[in-house]
C-alpha cells in the first residue's frame, strides 16, 4: 500500500473519530441542559393554590313593616246632642226620634200634665187606653196568653178627677198625705202628674189584686211580659233600683208604651224613661211633648 493511501485512511479515521467525539459532546451538552432545567424546575416551588374563599353570605334584609292604616278618628259629638249626652253616661248613641212626639210625653213628680187629654180613647178588655196603643197592647197580652199565662188589665186611663180621688184614697189607706213612702218615693201620684192620665200605660197582672205591690214580680206572667214587652213597644215604667231617678216606688205591673225603637234601647241599656228623655231634652220643668 502506498503511503498516500495510508495517509488518506488515517485522515478518514481521524475524521470519523472527530465526528464521534462531537456527537458525544453534543449529547452530553443536551443531557446537561436537560438536567439543569430539571434542577431548576425542582428548585422552584410550585405555586401555592389560592385557598377557596367561602364568600360571606349577604345579610338578608329585614322586611319593611307595612304601617298600619291610621284610623280616622270618630268625630266628637256635640255634648248637648243626644249622642253627646249618651256618651257622657257611657251609653251608645240613642235612636233618631222626635222626642216631642206623643208617645214620649213625660208625667212624673216634676212634670205636670194637668191639662192633657188623649185625643181618642178606646176600651180594651174593660180598660180605657189611648187608641194609638190599643193594637200593641192587645198583641202583647195575646203573646203572653199564648205561653199559657193569665193576663188581667187592671187599670188604664184615669182622668184628672179620677186620679185625684185615687190619690186621696191611697194616702188615707197608707196613713200619708203626700203620696210618698218612708223613703220619699211616690206610692201614688198627685192628680196631674200620673201617667194614667196619658192613656199610654196600663197596670197588668195575672189576676185581680185589691192591692198591687212588689210581690207581683214573682208571677210567671210578669216575668215573661217584662222580658218581652219591648218587642211590642212597652217598657216597665218604674223599675227596681231606679226609684231615685223616677221618684216612684218599684211597680212590677205598670207598663208604658213608648214605641218599639225606644223600648228596645231603654231595655237593652237598663235605663228608665226619665234617663231616656233626658238624652234629648232637659227634663224637670221642661215642657212636655205635643198632646197629639
Residue spans for each PLM region:
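Extracytoplasmic cell-surface/polysaccharide-interacting catalytic and binding patches
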Residues: 2-292
